[in-house]
Structure formats: structure tokens, C-alpha cells
């Protein structure tokens, strides 16, 4: 795992937290170094406005999970394959996709949705970066819920509600 943060001390603390949780964690000195050889790039920031204006940081055509939704400038969004969970919902609140729509005057830069990808009606374009912006999916909500459930189960305080959870599905079966 390669970690970059505008605040070096935050990156160092996160690398320390990752120690023992993954094979290795190192701090990058800049965003370009962090992205250079990555197959997967995850943006999880508190950025209120885009700060990534140069798409060349994704020259190796990675998959980009854009959780924080406001990191990428419209010119970057226009140059990648954009996939979102809900096109309408993602075009609000000055997200990167919303700003691109305002600048470009259309939504033609959105290739499709996660459902399109899952159903096979949309194929990933591996010749360029693929950016997934999950604005309405509630990914962080699910992660926190999973953490709480795991902790409650481990502590013996979880209450099972029969039929509430769908059993894990295997994509290989």
C-alpha cells in the first residue's frame, strides 16, 4: 500500500496504523509517486474542491475508486471512463462529476453505472483510467455497519434477526 496525504504526518500515522495489517505500507512524497505504479487508486479525502488537474498521474490506466467525490478536476473526469452508482444523484453538490457536467454541458462523459458493469452491458475500458464514483451507494455506511456488526458479534452483544442478512454469494459459482 502506498499512502499519500497533503499532510505528511497524517500519511505517516496511517502507514503506522497499516503496519501488520498488510504486507507493506509506505508514504509517497507526492500524488504522482503514489499513483505511478498503482493498479488501484483510492481517494478518501475531505477535499471540498478538485486538486487533481493533470490526468497524467493515471498514465498506467488504473481503476480509481473516487470515494471522496471531489478530488478530480473536470478535465481529468473528461479524459477517463466514468462509472457511477446513480448518474442523477452523482450530479449534485459540486462533486467532480457535477463540475464536469457544468463545464462540458452534458453528461456524455459518464460511460454508465455499476449496474451496467455488473450486468455486462458496459465493459471496462482498460486502455484508459476507470473512475468509479459511488455517490449514492453508501459504501462508507456499509463499511461502518460491517465494522460495528463484527465488533458486536465478537463481544457477544449482536442480536441476530433471522432472514435479515442475505448469505454471502460467490461470484465463482
Model features per residue range: what roles?
Residues 21-99:
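Rossmann-like adenosine-cofactor binding region
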Residues 1-18:
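NAD(P)-binding Rossmann-fold cofactor-contacting core
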Residues 2, 23-27, 109, 116:
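Hydrophobic/basic alpha-helical segments enriched in Actinobacteria
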Residues 76-171:
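Adenosine-phosphate binding glycine-rich loop
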Residues 1-4, 30, 160-164:
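Beta-strand segments within the central parallel beta-sheet cores of soluble alpha/beta enzyme folds
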Residues 40, 171-173:
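Anionic, Ser/Thr-rich low-complexity intrinsically disordered regions
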Amino acid at each position: 500500500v502506498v499512502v499519500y496525504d497533503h499532510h505528511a504526518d497524517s500519511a505517516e500515522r496511517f502507514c503506522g496504523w497499516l503496519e501488520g495489517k498488510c504486507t507493506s505500507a509506505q508514504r509517497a512524497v507526492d500524488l504522482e509517486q503514489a499513483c505511478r505504479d498503482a493498479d488501484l487508486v483510492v481517494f478518501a479525502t475531505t477535499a471540498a474542491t478538485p486538486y487533481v488537474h493533470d490526468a497524467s498521474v493515471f498514465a498506467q490506466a488504473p481503476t480509481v475508486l473516487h470515494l471522496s467525490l471531489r478530488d478530480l478536476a473536470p478535465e481529468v473526469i473528461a479524459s477517463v471512463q466514468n462509472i457511477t452508482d446513480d448518474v442523477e444523484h452523482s450530479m449534485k453538490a459540486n462533486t467532480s462529476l457535477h463540475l464536469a457536467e457544468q463545464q462540458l454541458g452534458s453528461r456524455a462523459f459518464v460511460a454508465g453505472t455499476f449496474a451496467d458493469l455488473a450486468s455486462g452491458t458496459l465493459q471496462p475500458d482498460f486502455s484508459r483510467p476507470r473512475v468509479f464514483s459511488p455517490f449514492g451507494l453508501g459504501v462508507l455506511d456499509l463499511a461502518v455497519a460491517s465494522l460495528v456488526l463484527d465488533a458486536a458479534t465478537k463481544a457477544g452483544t449482536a442480536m441476530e434477526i433471522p432472514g435479515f442478512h442475505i448469505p454471502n454469494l460467490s461470484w465463482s459459482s
